[in-house]
Amino acid sequence: DTLYSFCAKIRDIIDNDGYSNLGFTFVGSHYVPVWKDRLTFAYRLGVQANIAGEIPYYFINNLNTLFFRKVYTEGLGGNASVRGINRNGVVGNGMAWLNAELRWRFVNFRFINQNFHLALNPFFDMGQVIQSYRLDEQKAAAKAYSDTTVNPFYSGDKEKLHATLGCGLKVVMNRNFVISVEMAKAMDKRDGEKMWNNIGFNYLF
């Protein structure tokens, strides 16, 4: 009863307006050497869930992290989680995602008196909503558009994995400065029909 009472009141602890919530986030990465320092299998697993209260709409796309690597967070999609899906394409009260890639350093060379290497990282990403966000409201709004061909609020489809395939090229100087070029494609056209691409710095994780 004590735990139930605490969870029931957690939304009003901060502002009494229903914009407080208690959440849980787990993100773990693992790197497995396959062949010397030339080939590495790397993967990252993330789970984020809402325990109590209600997440405000303007915070629903936030992925919590202890180590700030990106300027912004964007739900599952874009360049910070599931590469190849439209930015903010998959959001919910709770989300889970997996990034898996092979990192192959295939060329070493010296240039301007610095050590460089080139690397490829073919990857497979996937994610899924594990807690829906205001699903009842989406269903209610869908009834108002029941006579339209494509419903903008609720498709009626059961949530499933959103997966992508892609590859990246890395130009690395002295092992600590990384220029990254990545391209990916969603395996379901509803997650994005065009080829996704991104130019930036560092590996994703």
Task: Mark where each language-model region is.
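Transmembrane beta-barrel architecture of outer-membrane proteins
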Residues: 21-25, 95-99, 162-166, 176, ...
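Short, contiguous acidic/charged loop-to-helix segments that flank catalytic cores in large enzymes
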Residues: 85-92, 149-160, 187-189
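Residue-level signature of outer-membrane beta-barrel architecture
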Residues: 30-32, 102-106, 171-173, 183-185, ...
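Outer-membrane beta-barrel "beta-signal"
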Residues: 171, 176, 193-205
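Conserved active-site loop/cleft motifs that coordinate metal ions or position small ligands
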Residues: 121-123, 175-184
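Flexible, surface-exposed loop regions and adjacent strand-edge segments
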Residues: 23, 58-68, 136-144, 196-202
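C-terminal outer-membrane beta-barrel translocator/porin domains of Gram-negative envelope proteins
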Residues: 1-114, 130-132, 151
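Outer-membrane beta-barrel transmembrane domain signature
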Residues: 119-165
